[in-house]
Regions:
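A detector for small-residue-rich transmembrane helices and their helix-helix packing motifs
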Residues: 1-133
Length: 133
């Protein structure tokens, strides 16, 4: 429950800050929280297999997590559909961080996978900083 609540807050806060200069932007729902729970499970069990509906091939969870973050970044940059990509992205960050805080030993167990999963977040932050400057 704590992962859900923190992911909900982080996802909504991220969306609020990302879209604060867009007066007509609106979003509702808890998909950022759900994304945080999913991303938390990906961090805890990176080798579990996940299947996407449009690609019925089992993928390791960490590959799914990386691809999902890249898709969210793409969706944010292109304003794709009526989907809260920013809330999903923020929720994933919240789920990742709270999981690492609650269970820090996972860092030793899966350091390289966690670094791979953090890479899209860092690339997004660098790109965002370049746009601001």
């Amino acid at each position: 429950l704590i992962i859900y609540i923190i992911s909900l807050y982080v996802g909504n806060y991220f969306a609020l800050k990302f879209h604060e200069k867009e007066p007509y932007y609106s979003a509702v729902g808890a998909s950022g929280a759900v994304t945080g729970v999913v991303y938390s499970s990906v961090v805890l069990y990176p080798e579990m297999k996940l299947i996407m509906l449009f690609l019925p091939i089992p993928l390791p969870a960490y590959i799914f997590g990386i691809c999902y973050l890249l898709y969210s970044i793409y969706g944010m940059n292109k304003n794709l559909g009526n989907i809260g990509h920013t809330a999903h992205f923020g929720g994933a960050i919240g789920g990742l961080l709270i999981t690492l805080i609650i269970k820090p030993e996972i860092i030793d167990e899966n350091l390289w996978i966690i670094l791979l999963m953090i890479t899209p977040i860092l690339l997004f932050a660098i790109n965002l900083k370049k746009k601001i400057i």
